[in-house]
Amino acid sequence: MFNILKQVGDYAKGSVQAAKYIGQGLAVTFDHMRRRPVTVQYPYEKLIPSERFRGRIHFEFDKCIACEVCVRVCPINLPVVDWEFNKAVKKKELKHYSIDFGVCIFCGNCVEYCPTNCLSMTEEYELASYDRHELNYDNVALGRLPYKVTQDPMVTPLRELGYLPKGVLSPHDLPKGSQRAGKHPQEILEEMETTSTKSE
């Protein structure tokens, strides 16, 4: 008899504990339901990277002196520098330069230690491709001018999630009236109506 009562008591305790955990989970769910969305609707919305963002490396062929400092400071000896020694002017002549972004860890050592500043980090981060060999950028691909999110007219650049006010660690901690990333469909329709009336 005592054993049955103990089992019933344990079952009741377990039920109360399970109900408590379910209640805690639902409280978190309902708390998030009251908040504005923070989802970035990629690729139609993109975050503006911070000033020190380490994206695709930009290379200026004319500035490079083929010193190979970038290869020596790279933790994985990644940049491939092909050069020939010109006996007439007694200097190295750069023939080819390439970086494989499928292997690069974007540490920025090559940019920091380059004596002629021919390497720089850009804001580009969309390097995905179907073939891994396409990630091996030669001096022509590296020399392409960097692309910025704010230059694309089809994309809405979002600054809110990239730059939060001082002391705010989460976008949810912002005051209720402040602008947030992610708009309700009604707000988007209102914006479209106002822009169409202004253009007329």
Curated annotation (Swiss-Prot):
Cofactor note: Binds 2 [4Fe-4S] clusters per subunit.
Biological process according to GO: photosynthesis, light reaction
Keyword 4Fe-4S: yes
Annotated organism of origin: Gloeothece citriformis (strain PCC 7424) (Cyanothece sp. (strain PCC 7424))
Protein name in the entry: NAD(P)H-quinone oxidoreductase subunit I
InterPro entries: 4Fe4S_Fe-S-bd, 4Fe4S_Fe_S_CS, NADH_quinone_OxRdtase_chainI, NDHI
Protein function: NDH-1 shuttles electrons from an unknown electron donor, via FMN and iron-sulfur (Fe-S) centers, to quinones in the respiratory and/or the photosynthetic chain. The immediate electron acceptor for the enzyme in this species is believed to be plastoquinone. Couples the redox reaction to proton translocation, and thus conserves the redox energy in a proton gradient.
Keyword vocabulary terms for this entry: 4Fe-4S, Iron, Iron-sulfur, Membrane, Metal-binding, NAD, NADP, Plastoquinone, Quinone, Repeat, Thylakoid, Translocase
Top-rank taxon: Bacteria
PROSITE patterns per the UniProt record, alphabetical: 4FE4S_FER_1, 4FE4S_FER_2
A Gene Ontology cellular-component term: plasma membrane-derived thylakoid membrane
Region of interest (Disordered), ranges: 172-200
Assembly, per entry: NDH-1 is composed of at least 11 different subunits.
Chief location bin: membrane
EC number(s) per entry: 7.1.1.-
Subcellular location: Cellular thylakoid membrane
Coiled-coil residue spans: none
Topology versus the membrane: Peripheral membrane protein
Phylogenetic placement of the source organism: Bacteria, Bacillati, Cyanobacteriota, Cyanophyceae, Oscillatoriophycideae
Residues annotated to bind [4Fe-4S] cluster 1: C64, C67, C70, C114
